[in-house]
Regions:
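Active-site-proximal betaalpha loop/short-helix elements
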Residues: 91-94, 184-261
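Glycine-rich phosphate/pyrophosphate-binding loop regions near the starts of catalytic domains
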Residues: 5-166, 171, 180
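Acidic, Ser/Thr/Pro-rich beta/coil linker or hinge segments at domain junctions
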Residues: 284-327
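Helix N-cap motif at beta-to-alpha junctions
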Residues: 269-275
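Aromatic/hydrophobic pocket-lining residues that form π-stacking "cages" and hydrophobic walls in ligand
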Residues: 69, 102, 106, 221, ...
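Short Gly/Ser/Thr- and Asp/Glu-enriched loop/turn motifs at secondary-structure junctions
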Residues: 29-30, 259-264
Length: 327
């Protein structure tokens, strides 16, 4: 299970076994493929969703599938999706009313994101051969400029567009029927309009983007640092975490930096553009809690260092079954 939970094991599986080394497009290993199309780029991304439970506070597998694919497109600069495909694998006997509810949720999220479902496929397997429902979505969009997760430069500031750990904690509480107090809600949401606003404000001053899903911000930042050849220093005191999420994480022995998010983005921004980008993000309903959380340097390349206010320590890359089946 750890090879699908995000973090080092999953990254190594993809790098060493799954990626097509003969393809210069696939070998980049970003959130999607960028295919040249005249003076623009066709961005293609795909994602399969196996979350348990299928419905959780703040969302469900349908909203998650649409938002996750739209967000992967947006992270590469394609903020106006052309369309999505949807593949369903259903377990025999799956309740029709539940399927209608999930389908309605997908439709609402597609409308929210401006991303129509243009094609699909449905398969049914026997009882016990699949756990309820597996949902795959593929998305395509056009980008005028591709933004890679490998574009960080020394001196760039790191902005997170909101609070960390909301999705993972909400799903974990629902899965195990934990009464952790407070209003725990997933943050699952399509971010393309927020990212569009950030790109309009910051232009080329935005050097890199990534959504911190499986493995949380820690996994995403490690990947960005390694690909970009920079070191990252985080300010722990600047990390936005809701009180109820922090309390639940402490109770469960989890680090909010390693907990999945489904409605947040990490932006690498040139210092000259940081203020205007931060203002643009905070002006969006999904970015009100955005914060500058760190800076890139030429030291300790490929590493992430956490400044706690009392000292500094290396932030390890997540590995293992922290929160399996979280998306």
């Amino acid at each position: 299970m750890k090879h699908g939970a995000g973090g080092r094991s999953m990254r190594l599986l993809i790098e060493q076994v799954l990626v097509d080394r003969t393809s210069p497009i696939a070998n980049v290993m970003d959130d999607g493929a960028a295919i040249p199309l005249g003076d623009e780029w066709l961005i293609v991304t795909t994602d399969s969703h196996v979350i348990h439970p299928l419905v959780f506070p703040g969302g469900d597998i349908g909203r998650l599938a649409v938002a996750g694919t739209v967000n992967d497109l947006a992270m590469m600069g394609a903020t106006e999706p052309l369309g999505l495909t949807c593949g369903l694998i259903l377990e025999e006997g799956f309740p029709l009313d539940d399927l209608k509810t999930i389908r309605s949720s997908m439709e609402r999220t597609c409308t929210e994101a401006g991303a129509p479902i243009v094609s699909g496929d449905t398969k049914v397997m026997g009882r016990g051969e699949v756990d309820g429902l597996v949902l795959n979505t593929t998305g395509v969009g056009i980008a005028r400029r591709v933004v890679r997760d490998s574009g960080l430069k020394p001196g760039d500031l790191l902005i997170v567009t909101g609070t960390l750990g909301d999705h993972g904690i909400a799903v974990m509480a629902a899965r195990h029927q934990l009464d952790l107090g407070g209003a725990l809600q997933s943050d699952v949401a399509p971010l393309n309009s927020l990212i569009r606003a950030a790109l309009l404000a910051g232009g080329d001053g935005i050097s890199a983007m990534k959504d911190p899903t499986r493995g949380g911000a820690a996994s995403a930042l490690h990947e960005m640092a390694e690909k970009s050849g920079v070191g990252i220093q985080l300010d722990e005191r600047a990390l936005p975490v809701r009180d109820e999420v922090r309390a639940a994480a402490e109770l469960l022995g989890l680090d909010p930096l390693m907990i999945a998010n489904e409605g947040k983005a990490l932006l690498g921004v040139h210092p000259d553009a940081a203020d205007i980008v931060l203002r643009a993000v905070r002006a969006h309903p999904l970015g009100r809690d955005a914060a500058v959380i760190g800076v890139c340097s030429g030291e300790l390349r490929g590493s992430v260092v956490l400044d706690t206010g009392f000292g500094r320590r290396l932030l390890t890359e997540p590995d293992g079954e922290l929160l399996p089946r979280i998306c």
